[in-house]
Swiss-Prot record:
Predominant cellular place of this UniProt entry's protein: membrane
Subunit structure: Component of the heterotrimeric retriever complex formed by VPS26C, VPS29 and VPS35L. Interacts with VPS29. Interacts with COMMD1, CCDC93 and CCDC22; associates with the CCC (COMMD/CCDC22/CCDC93) complex which contains at least COMMD1 (and possibly other COMM domain-containing proteins), CCDC22 and CCDC93. Interacts with WASHC1, WASHC2A and WASHC2C. Interacts with SNX17 and SNX31.
Cysteine pairs bridged by disulfides in the record: none
Region listing for Disordered, in residue ranges: 43-69, 94-113
Membrane topology classification: Single-pass membrane protein
Its job: Acts as a component of the retriever complex. The retriever complex is a heterotrimeric complex related to retromer cargo-selective complex (CSC) and essential for retromer-independent retrieval and recycling of numerous cargos such as integrin alpha-5/beta-1 (ITGA5:ITGB1). The recruitment of the retriever complex to the endosomal membrane involves CCC and WASH complexes.
Keywords noted in UniProt: Endosome, Membrane, Phosphoprotein, Protein transport, Transmembrane, Transmembrane helix, Transport
Family label: Belongs to the VPS35L family.
Listed transmembrane segments: 703-719
UniProt-recorded name of the protein: VPS35 endosomal protein-sorting factor-like
One GO biological process term: endocytic recycling
Biased composition annotated in UniProt, kind: Low complexity: 53-69
Name of the coding gene: VPS35L
Species in which this protein is naturally found: Pongo abelii (Sumatran orangutan)
């Protein structure tokens, strides 16, 4: 291609801005406006005549601001009209019926405020473990009865099933001995799966045999420490069985015509379902032993709904009385817990049965301290303090069920009944664990009196105080009692010798102290914790509790100047000597500071303490630290840095940033934040001085610039460095530090060749060229206003950058280099204008320095021609079939650049634009719609006074036709 000279179009930026500005249109009152709120007319209709085909109505209208979506209703909501015309009496009746139904449902359904059994299950399994050997009886499946004829009479079938049941009870089982706890759990899981498999294969009798076998296991207390966990595992199987039976009977009530509603009555169930249900209850009634008969019947208690409305209410008292036949108090209380659990699931409104269970339990409570239990404990070698903690899971659950939405009078009666019993620490603990926190808190002094009277031997008092403290963390006691409560509790807590007992109790009461008292009392508590946990390095075994103490303290002390003035707070942190734990605590502290610190601070106490905390977090970073962890630590440290401000003392602020850089050099995001902060500091200085720096402030901003220039090379991210060089150079330029700005821009230019082909973005490798293009476009926008250095040639920075772009190894089949050259052409065109588009205050750009000098313009045009030659050469290489679409796109892009920035009165440039137009359409690859819009734009521009030459150009630009 021939060489084409470049001639830039003279631009009048003010006139162009004026022509692009939207025309202001005066708006009369009441005219439509797109931002005006929509008003909808609401019609209130009153029905006058109910009979006959016509009715008269009276309406009143009012305007109101409503949701824009309501505008589609054209005034009146049809549902509102329907409601307005409804019969008031019918509406009232419907409302009353709905309210009664809702009240009934509220009583029959347990709300979300009731803690479900599933939440306690995992805790019980984790807490009650054993290393002793266990035994279990496994059902050995018999083939007897599996094959039968379909012609057997109903009585024969029943007799056969009962015989199978007898066969199981008479010894079709195998006892496995010397099982570890895990083996035992695995066997139970196998039984659960066997139950499901038998049910799925329609072997209902086998399923029942498995359940009976499992329901015998609660009677075995040979390894008593494991009993609560055994109970959980066995009741899981019972729950599965109950669910399978219920769903089976429920499915019998569903036919092709109707579906049984959730709240159905026995009348909705068909005869087949009722007969099957009775059959199950009769089978269970034939179980000879009390405990398995009780558990299996309780598991299918819900099935009574198919038989009668009063079935459940009649069965629950009977099952409650059955438990009286269980002699072992531990087995008995867990049976009551299971009955209460089933009762709450199927009939939570039947409170009388729950209460009866509780009062029956109180009558047998003395058995716990009787000779039978004591002899059993001696045989197993279990002490009473180890035996009593087996009861709370069951007792807590019974108490929770009874106290749920219970009236104050019942709770008071229960409390008084417990008070009358001797050795009632166990009961008292369950009362405090299950009753509402508000009930406990208002009677705190009464409970403290009861705790004092308890016998220490069976159940330690510190556990009772811990339970009381848990309630006081949720509800406030009377204000007049608060100090006395703390004193009474702490007298007991501080006397504890065992560090674990002490810290478990102290951790709970710290929250009460923080909530109701000042830093003085909190400091006393922290000092006492340090005193107890420091000897023999006891803190090493109690890091979770110590962490909770810190979290509770910082949750209540949002003012860090108050928090850090607590004398023992920092010594308390010194107990966290395990690095991972110490870092977690530091993260909690910094997170609280970022959330709650409202104003920037310069308090030296806060700064010194939190710098130490941040330094601890930073020093934990090593080669194995995950990126997510580094990101989190950087976020916390950056949050602290942003909240430090020394006001107008900018030098002190810079000193803080210098110190921070030395402390946090291993976290790149922190260094980036420091660079941004220092740049902002320089700009704040400029703002204070209104751009007129004194000798002192000029030296200060140069120090800020030097800080950034020194810090940026230590960063790893290539584009992070490039963007910071550019940003810092702009700040230097704004503060009239011209030589420093040149240094930043030169550093950025010298860094471009180091940009790799692929970069890691969020863990994925991506091509870097698009990011490089974006950076260079931003760079070009800055270079427009950078003045030339007097000791260097014209446009020396642009020339250096062009050389780097030329030498950079671009991807094959990539057009990014040409897009960059096109942007360079835009830059050079803007540089040739008499007055530039924008300037920096008190910085003379090249338009002022050269004043439109012909030599400068000639150099500029020569660079333009060089760039144009590169673009045209590249277009020439795209003449292959597979690259024609790229050639068309780039050709049209270059055409638009010439149209926007070139002087098309020059014949050669004009002819080049025509050639590019034809090139874009030559092979049918151009987007016709884009070409049409471009041509329309040219014709529109040609109507402007200084653009009439575009009329002739438009005539020479034909649109391609498709045949």
């Amino acid at each position: 291609m021939a060489v084409f000279p470049w001639h830039s179009r003279n631009r009048n930026y003010k006139a162009e801005f004026a022509s692009c500005r939207l025309e202001a249109v005066p708006l009369e009152f009441g005219d439509y406006h797109p931002l005006k709120p929509i008003t909808v007319t609401e019609s209130k209709t009153k029905k006058v005549n109910r009979k006959g085909s016509t009715s008269s109505t009276s309406s009143s209208s009012s305007s109101s601001v409503v949701d824009p979506l309501s505008s589609v209703l054209d005034g009146t909501d049809p549902l509102s009209m329907f409601a307005a015309t409804a019969d008031p009496a019918a509406l009232a009746a419907a409302t009353d019926s709905s309210r009664k139904k809702r009240d009934r449902d509220d009583n029959s359904i347990v709300g979300s405020d009731f803690e479900p059994w599933a939440n306690k299950r995992g805790e019980i399994l984790a807490r009650y473990t054993t290393t002793e050997k266990l035994s279990i009886n496994l059902f050995m499946g018999s083939e007897k009865g599996k094959a039968g004829t379909a012609t057997l009479a109903m009585s024969e079938k029943v007799r056969t099933r009962l015989e199978e049941l007898d066969d199981f009870e008479e010894g079709s089982q195998k006892e496995l001995l010397n099982l570890t706890q895990q083996d035992y759990v695995n066997r139970i899981e196998e039984l659960n799966q066997s139950l499901k498999d038998a049910w799925a294969s329609d072997q209902k009798v086998k399923a029942l045999k498995i359940v009976i076998q499992c329901s015998k296991l609660p009677s075995d207390t040979s390894v008593i420490q494991f009993y609560p966990s055994k109970f959980v595992l066995i009741t899981d199987i019972l729950d599965t069985f109950g669910k399978l039976v219920y769903e089976r009977i429920f499915s019998m009530c569903v036919d092709n015509r109707s579906v049984l509603p959730d709240h159905f009555s026995p009348e909705n169930a068909n005869d087949t379902a009722k007969e099957t249900c009775l059959n199950w209850f009769f089978k269970i009634a034939s179980i000879r032993e009390l405990i398995p008969r009780f558990y299996v019947e309780a598991s299918i208690l819900k099935c009574n709904k198919f038989l009668s409305k009063t079935g459940i209410s009649e069965c629950l008292p009977r099952l409650t009385c059955m438990i009286r036949g269980i002699g072992d108090p531990l087995v008995s209380v867990y049976a009551r817990a299971y009955l209460c659990r089933v009762g709450m699931e199927v009939a939570p409104h039947l409170k009388e049965t729950l209460n009866k269970n509780f009062f029956d339990f109180l009558l047998t409570f003395k058995q716990i301290h009787g000779d039978t239990v004591q002899n059993q404990l001696v045989v197993q070698g279990v002490e009473l303090p180890s035996y009593l903690p087996l009861y709370p899971p069951a007792m807590d659950w019974i108490f929770q069920c009874i106290s749920y939405h219970a009236p104050e009078a019942l709770l008071t009666e229960m409390m008084e009944r417990c008070k009358k019993l001797g050795n009632n620490a166990l009961l008292l603990n369950s009362v405090m664990s299950a009753f509402r926190a508000e009930f406990i808190a208002t009677r705190s002094m009464d409970f403290i009196g009861m705790i004092k009277e308890c016998d220490e031997s069976g159940f330690p008092k510190h556990l009772l105080f811990r339970s009381l403290g848990l309630n006081l963390a949720l509800a406030d006691p009377p204000e007049s009692d608060r100090l006395q409560i703390l004193n009474e509790a702490w007298k007991v807590i501080t006397k504890l010798k065992n560090p674990q007992d002490y810290i478990n109790c102290a951790e709970v009461w710290v929250e009460y102290t923080c909530k109701h008292f000042t830093k003085r009392e909190v400091n006393t508590v922290l000092a006492d914790v340090i005193k107890h946990m420091t000897p023999d390095r006891a803190f090493e075994d109690s890091y979770p509790q110590l962490q909770l103490i810190i979290k509770k303290v910082i949750a209540h002390f949002h003012d860090f100047s108050v928090l850090l003035s607590v004398e023992k707070f920092l010594p308390f942190l010194d107990m966290f000597q395990k690095e991972s734990v110490r870092v977690e605590v530091c993260k909690c502290i910094m997170d609280a500071f970022i959330k709650h610190q409202q104003e920037p601070t310069k308090d030296p106490v806060i700064l010194n303490a939190l710098l130490h905390v941040c330094k601890t977090m930073h020093d934990s970073v090593n080669a194995l630290t995950l990126e997510d962890e580094k990101r989190m630590l950087s976020y916390l440290i950056n949050g602290f840095i942003k909240m430090v401000s020394f006001g107008r003392d900018f030098e002190q602020q810079l000193s803080f940033y210098v110190e921070s850089r030395s402390m946090f050099c291993n976290l790149e995001p922190v260094l980036v934040q420091l660079i941004h902060s220092v740049n902002r500091l320089a700009m704040e200085t400029r703002k204070v001085m209104k751009g007129n720096h004194s000798r002192k402030t000029a030296a200060f901003v140069r120090a800020c610039v030097a800080y950034c220039f020194i810090t940026i090379p230590s960063l790893v991210g290539i584009f992070t460095r490039l963007n910071l060089y550019l940003h810092s150079g702009q700040v230097a330029l704004a503060n009239q530090c011209l030589s420093q700005a040149d240094a930043f821009f030169k550093a950025a230019i010298s860094l471009v060749p180091e940009v790799p082909k692929m970069i890691n973005i969020d863990g994925k490798m991506r091509p870097s060229e698009s990011f490089l293009l974006e950076f260079l476009c931003n760079f070009f926008s800055t270079l427009l206003i950078v003045p030339d250095h007097p000791e260097h040639g014209v446009l020396f920075l642009v020339r250096e950058l062009l050389n780097v772009i030329q030498d950079y190894t671009w991807e094959d089949n990539s057009d990014e280099k040409i897009r960059i050259y096109t942007c360079v052409l835009h830059l050079l065109s803007a540089m040739s204008q008499e007055t530039y588009l924008y300037h920096i205050d008190k910085v003379d750009s090249n338009d002022s320095l050269y004043g439109g000098d012909s030599k400068f313009l000639a150099e500029n045009n020569k660079l333009c021609e060089t760039v144009m030659a590169q673009i045209l050469e590249h277009l020439k290489t795209l003449a292959k079939d597979e690259a024609l679409k790229r050639q068309s796109s780039l050709g049209l892009s270059f055409f638009n650049s010439i149209l926007a920035h070139g002087d098309l009165r020059n014949n050669k440039l004009n002819q080049l634009s025509v050639n590019l137009w034809h090139l874009a359409q030559r092979h049918g690859c151009a987007d016709t719609r884009t070409m049409v819009k471009t041509l329309e734009y040219i014709k529109k521009q040609s109507k402007q006074p200084d653009m009439t030459h575009l009329t002739e150009l438009a005539l020479r630009l034909p649109l391609q036709t498709r045949t």
